[in-house]
């Protein structure tokens, strides 16, 4: 498709890693590149997502949705095409009928926008702050660097979610747990205890 790939906070660790099409997150914690990629598109393809914040979804373009749970189809947005099925198997079947798109101008436009967003975010980590006033963006970027490639992060609702969304990077092995749908408070410790399996927990 040569299309930008946008993900939710919940899907960050699974979708972001080594993905040349990714242009950042959508939602309240998302990036302009993610938002505009969806709203400036001709068609939005939603894969296995029950993203609950419909205010961030476009309402004036065609939307196709694939989900293994039929009750999710059209629940968050007006869907023009809804397919019930396993996302991986559905995509594999549909690829055989797809004509490859060679025009990548829209993708390149959003990737350029995303590079600007990442540059702006990185600027916050360059200033460590002062004694007893360490900047949280710097702290989170250091946590990202020091954590193992297979770390499991738990984030509480609030600013830790913001910093985690922006500065913890996917490696293909990392996971992140949080109250992504309901925004429940003070859940990170219980998530951590529930995940005590010998993994590197942060």
Cite the ranges covered by each PLM segment.
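Glycine-rich, anion-gripping cofactor-binding loops and their flanking helix/strand elements
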Residues: 1-68, 171-189
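Cofactor-pocket helix-loop regions in the catalytic cores of large enzyme subunits
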Residues: 1-20, 112-184
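Short, contiguous clusters of charged residues that form electrostatic/catalytic patches at enzyme active sites
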Residues: 32, 36-39, 89-92, 137-141, ...
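Glycine/Thr-rich phosphate-binding loops of Rossmann-like dinucleotide-binding domains
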Residues: 53-55, 73, 92, 163
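Phosphate/pyrophosphate-binding active-site segments
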Residues: 60-157
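Conserved small/polar residues in nucleotide/adenosyl-binding loops
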Residues: 190-197
């Amino acid at each position: 498709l040569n299309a930008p790939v946008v993900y939710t906070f919940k899907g960050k660790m699974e979708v972001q890693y080594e993905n040349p099409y990714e242009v950042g997150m959508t939602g309240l914690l998302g990036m302009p590149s993610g938002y505009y990629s969806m709203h400036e598109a001709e068609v939005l393809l939603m894969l296995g997502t029950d993203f609950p914040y419909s205010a961030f979804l476009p309402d004036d373009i065609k939307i196709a949705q694939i989900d293994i749970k039929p009750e999710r189809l059209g629940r968050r947005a007006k869907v023009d095409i809804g397919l019930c099925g396993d996302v991986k198997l559905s995509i594999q079947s549909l690829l055989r009928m797809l004509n490859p798109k060679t025009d990548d101008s829209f993708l390149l436009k959003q990737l350029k926008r995303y590079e600007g967003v990442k540059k702006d975010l990185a600027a916050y980590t360059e200033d460590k702050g002062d004694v007893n006033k360490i900047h949280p963006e710097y702290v989170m970027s250091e946590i990202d660097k020091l954590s193992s490639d297979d770390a499991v992060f738990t984030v509480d609702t609030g600013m830790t979610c913001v910093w985690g969304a922006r500065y913890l990077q996917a490696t293909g092995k990392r996971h992140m747990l949080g109250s992504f749908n309901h925004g429940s408070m003070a859940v990170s410790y219980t998530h951590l205890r529930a995940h005590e399996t010998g993994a590197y927990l942060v």
